[in-house]
From Swiss-Prot:
Gene expressing this chain: rpsR
Gene Ontology terms for molecular function: small ribosomal subunit rRNA binding; structural constituent of ribosome
Keyword RNA-binding found: yes
HAMAP family named in the record: Ribosomal_bS18
Keywords: Ribonucleoprotein, Ribosomal protein, RNA-binding, rRNA-binding
Organism: Rickettsia bellii (strain OSU 85-389)
Protein name: Small ribosomal subunit protein bS18
Amino acid sequence: MSKNNTSETITRKPMERASKKVFFRRRKGCPLSVPNAPVIDYKNPELLIKFVSEGGRMLPSRITNVCAKKQRKLNNAIKIARILALLPFVFQAK
């Protein structure tokens, strides 16, 4: 049972990329670094709840556009507010 080996040249075309242009959104500045921005404080749960997901997890800075310095302050304030029962650890599903 021998196979016939035929020497055919196979020409491969390079994969064509879709002609979609990628548009990047301009990254906005930190919403907590502008003048008249609210102060990050564990006693302000209305502000802190904006930076917590529906499941109760802290949102990353790439989603909230908060700078690294303010993100650390936010994380600490959320943790303290949870310990003092100002924020729930896990939100109830409705």
